[in-house]
Amino acid sequence: MSVARLTTYNFRNLSSVAIDLHPKLNFFIGNNGSGKSSLLEALFFLGHGKSFRTSKVEHLACYETDNFVVSIKDVNDLQLGLSKNLQTGVTLIKINGERHARLSELAKNIAVQIVTPESFKLFFGGPKERRRFIELGMFHVKHDSSKQWREFNRVLKQRNACIRHNLDKATFDYWTGLFCQLSEQVAEVRSQYITNLISELPYWLEILLPNIADKVTVQYLQGWPQKKNLMDSLNDSHEREQAFGYSIYGAHKFDVKFLIAKQALESQLSRGQQKLFLLALTFAQAKLIARVNRVKPILLIDDIGAELDINSRESLSQALSILDCQVIITAIEEGVLQPFIDDVSVADKESSKKTKYHMFHVKHGGILPVNNSVKIE
C-alpha cells in the first residue's frame, strides 16, 4: 500500500491535516515538539489501533476535545478510516465507507512499521519490548494471532487467580491444562514467524552492517525450559508460583535474544550500529509482511539523523531504494536528508517527469509542502 492522501482531525497537536504524500519517499522537517512525531503516530494508530508513544488513548485527542479521526486514501482510491470518541469509548472503523468491527480487517489492507529513538528499548528495555516488536509484526502476518493471544491472556488471568486465591485442585488443574495447550499453540505459531523473520535478516545486514552480518545469531526462548515440556516445568515450580502469585512459565514469558559471537548485541555495537541493526530487523519484518500478506508496509522512521553518520545514512539510502515500499521520514534539519535526496534510485520509476519525493515543513502543528519538492521536474 501507498498512502496518497492523509487526513487527520483533532489528533494531538496537529492542525486539521489534509496532505498528499509521495508513493515512495516523504520527508517532514521541524523542531522538536512541532508535530512531526504526531504525524507518524496518526499513521501508526490507523495501522495498529494504538499509539507507539502512550497507552492512554485520551492523550491522542487535541487539547479540550473528546474525539479524533485519522483517515487515508491509497493510490488505488481505497479509503480507510479510524475514529475514537472518548466520551462514549466507541471506536469506529471504516473501509470504503462501510463500518467494520475489528482492527484485523484494517490490518489486511494497511501494515505500518516504525523505527523511533525509543526503539533502542528492543535491546535495553527487557523482554517486554522485544515481545512488542514481534507481536506488531505477527499482527500483520498472522491475522488470527490477536484472537489467539486474547484467549491465551484470558486463560492466564484465570490461572493466576487460581494461584493467588489457592482454589481447589480440580479448578486449578482445568485452567493449567488449558493454559499449557494454548501456550504450546502460541509458541508454535510464534516460532514459525521468528524463523521466517530471521531468514530475511541477513540480506539487510549485508547492506547496513556488512562487517558483522555473518556473526549475528538470533535465539528464540519459548517461555519455559527448552528441554522440558511446559506441564512438567509448572509442576516443578508450583511452590515458587504460590510464593510469587502468578505463572512463572508460559507463552507470555517468551523472549528473543540478538547475539554477536554469542555475546549480547548491545554490548558489541555502538549506538549508530545498533540503530542500523534495528533498521535491518525492521526491513526484514517489512519484507516478510509483504511476502505473506501481499500488502507492502508503510515504513515510518522518526528522527533519521539521530545516531547515524553520513556513511550510515548513505547505506540506509541504498537499503531504502531496494525495500520498495512507501517511506515517511522525519528530521530536525534538512541537511541530514541529503544522502536520500541525492540518491536517484528512489526516483519514481513510472515517469521521469514526476518528483522523486515530497518534503514538508512542520511548525506548531501545521504542515506545509516545500515548493521544490512538489513541482514537476
Swiss-Prot record:
One GO MF term attached to the UniProt entry: single-stranded DNA binding
Xref: InterPro entries: DNA-binding_RecF, P-loop_NTPase, RecF/RecN/SMC_N, RecF_2
GO cellular component: cytoplasm
Location in the cell: Cytoplasm
Keyword Glycoprotein recorded: no
BP GO terms, sorted: DNA replication; DNA synthesis involved in DNA repair; double-strand break repair; SOS response
Domain of life from the UniProt record: Bacteria
Keywords for this protein: ATP-binding, Cytoplasm, DNA damage, DNA repair, DNA replication, DNA-binding, Nucleotide-binding, SOS response
Region forming the signal peptide: none
Pfam family, one: SMC_N
Keyword hit for ATP-binding: yes
Binding locations of ATP: G30, N31, N32, G33, S34, G35, K36, S37
Family to which the UniProt record says this protein belongs: Belongs to the RecF family.
Function: The RecF protein is involved in DNA metabolism; it is required for DNA replication and normal SOS inducibility. RecF binds preferentially to single-stranded, linear DNA. It also seems to bind ATP.
HAMAP family: RecF
Protein name stated in the entry: DNA replication and repair protein RecF
Lineage, top ranks: Bacteria, Pseudomonadati, Pseudomonadota, Gammaproteobacteria, Alteromonadales
